[in-house]
Amino acid sequence: MKSSVCIELVFTEYPFLERIERAAEAGFDAIEFWNWDNKDLPAIKAAVDKAGLGIAAFQANLGGTLVHPDHQDSFVASIQKSLDKAQELGAPSMFLLTDELGDDRSVRFQFPELGEEKKYQSVLGGLTALAPLAEEAGVTLVLEPLNTRADHPGYFLNRSHIGFELVRAVDSPHIKVLYDIYHMQVMEGNVIETLTGNLDVIQHVHVADVPGRHEPGTGELNYANILKALR
């Protein structure tokens, strides 16, 4: 099991590129970040190479949504651009969201007229279309459930079991789930049993404590037992 750190959220007292050096000093194997289209990717690549780190993942979404069938073609085309960047950077994974988030991380367009079943089928169709593209690129798209109670009201994929179900239906080694312990503790709890029962479809795990999304050990979660179960 390798460790990576999201430098959007950690070491924020330093300039962005300097956070890579701080991550190496802290003993991480790799870094993560969110959007790629507003960053100097060659500079990031040079900095991680110099620090001896990898890029574990970054966000695939460039806008658009998986939940509306009329947006599927443009969404898939945008993800192809991200897959190309992942290949250039040597990143094995990219985070994939079902909805478009604004700068404040809220869902921009919720499409309540569609209903949950139509959204589900649209997401399934989009993932099915993305699977061969991800396979060809050698990159894994990790679908991320988020909480709708504290952070992202209106987000479609707010339960882990729906993500597991979708990924199993697509049945591709390059479409997996990102299980974020913070988000799913807020929504459903039962972290250890959920993790250990679905490791076949989980590619990536994010850690933070509840409440507040702070460092492990600052809240209600028993991270010693969670990490023991993962190992």
Model-predicted regions and their roles:
Residues 105-121, 148-155:
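Surface-exposed cleft-lining segments at the edges of enzyme active sites
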